[in-house]
Amino acid sequence: MRPLAALSQGIGLLMRGLIWLYRLFLSPLLGQNCRFDPSCSRYALEAITRHGPFWGLWLAVRRISRCHPWGGMGYDPVPDDPRPGRCGCKDAGPAVSAGSTEGNPGRRTDGTDPD
């Protein structure tokens, strides 16, 4: 394994570990306040796993910055390509509303997956 790849893998593992510690100890005290599905911590874990620690952190920070009462809400998946302008999403726009199936026709309006 190349040194840079090993460093990236180690940083990603550390970041995922910190998120799991947050989910285990701090999140139960704060309650479920996230306005998005998946929750911000699940989103961050998936983004780091799929895109590595650097792009994953960028996506997680962008998502957490939108998670406030005046921000968006609803279903907001991790994009396939995190590079700006290539994810097929609007950077400043809100996520799809919770009752809508727009952008994900396989998802039911009650928030459950069809199977």
From Swiss-Prot:
Source taxon at top rank: Bacteria
Keywords linked to the UniProt accession: Cell inner membrane, Cell membrane, Membrane
Membrane topology: Peripheral membrane protein
Cleaved signal peptide residues: none
A Pfam family this chain is assigned to: YidD
Main localization (coarse): membrane
GO annotations of cellular component type: plasma membrane
Record field: compositional bias (Basic and acidic residues): 105-115
Region annotated Disordered, chain positions: 81-115
Protein's UniProt keywords contain Acetylation: no
InterPro entries attached to this UniProt entry: Membr_insert_effic_factor_YidD (IPR002696)
Cell location: Cell inner membrane
NCBIfam families: membrane protein insertion efficiency factor YidD
Family: Belongs to the UPF0161 family.
UniProt function note: Could be involved in insertion of integral membrane proteins into the membrane.
UniProt-recorded name of the protein: Putative membrane protein insertion efficiency factor
Species this protein is from: Rhodospirillum rubrum (strain ATCC 11170 / ATH 1.1.1 / DSM 467 / LMG 4362 / NCIMB 8255 / S1)
